[in-house]
């Protein structure tokens, strides 16, 4: 499989649209977690003007340049919804502008690699606060297969995520069933001391049983 090397800055561009007309309000304000997802903001928004806030439109990325005290991860997310969010003007918002060469979903897969977190931390600079700047982001080398191959990787990745989420939902359902069964037993069965159902096993006995 042939790979072509690019500087990431050749494939992405900053997005600096602001909420000048106050079209978006407090419910649209988002933060970003180190799990690389958008979350509800934890900031106190009382009296804060939302005009300087950046728009994160569908398929846009946003990240926080400060990497210190982040658990060795960079705070970055990809808006995969059909909604527009707004984020603090201290964030950097960008999108893929060479969609003929790079799929945004493939780029987000790349960002989710532990190697990218290590790279961004290693290339962060500063004294009081270390930052991974936009210039540092753009200077990063990335090797890409064809768009068709990228799409295949994305499809496999999404299928794996769907399987994982289905498995986790199954565990949640099983837990609910077990909890309901135990609660039902508590109501129907008399309480007993468990002493007659258990016994202490010494180390010697354990070895003998093994």
Where are these predicted regions, by residue range?
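Low-complexity, Lys/Gly-biased intrinsically disordered segments
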Residues: 1-44, 49-52, 65-66, 70-72, ...
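Non-catalytic DNA-recognition/assembly elements of restriction-modification systems
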Residues: 1-19, 141-203
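A short glycine-rich beta-alpha junction/loop motif
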Residues: 84-90, 125-151
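Internal, well-ordered alpha/beta segment that forms a basic, Gly-enriched binding/recognition surface
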Residues: 116
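Short amphipathic beta-strand starts and helix->beta connectors
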Residues: 77-79, 123-126
């Amino acid at each position: 499989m042939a790979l072509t090397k690019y500087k990431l800055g050749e494939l992405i561009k900053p997005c600096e649209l602001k909420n000048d007309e106050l079209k978006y309000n407090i419910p649209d304000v988002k933060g970003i977690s180190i799990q690389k997802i958008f979350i509800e903001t934890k900031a106190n928004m009382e009296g804060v003007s939302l005009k300087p806030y950046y728009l994160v439109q569908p398929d846009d990325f946003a990240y926080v340049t400060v990497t210190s005290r982040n658990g060795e991860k960079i705070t970055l997310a990809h808006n995969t919804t059909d909604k527009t969010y707004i984020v603090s003007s201290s964030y950097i918002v960008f999108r893929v502008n060479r969609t003929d060469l790079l799929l945004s979903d493939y780029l987000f897969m790349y960002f989710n690699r532990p190697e990218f977190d290590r790279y961004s931390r290693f290339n962060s600079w500063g004294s009081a606060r270390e930052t991974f700047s936009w210039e540092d982001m753009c200077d990063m080398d990335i090797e890409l297969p064809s768009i068709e191959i990228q799409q295949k990787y994305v499809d496999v990745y999404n299928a794996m995520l769907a399987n994982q989420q289905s498995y986790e939902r199954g565990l949640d359902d099983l837990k609910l069933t077990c909890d309901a069964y135990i609660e039902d037993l508590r109501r129907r069965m008399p309480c007993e001391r468990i002493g007659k159902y258990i016994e202490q096993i010494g180390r010697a006995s354990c070895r003998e049983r093994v």
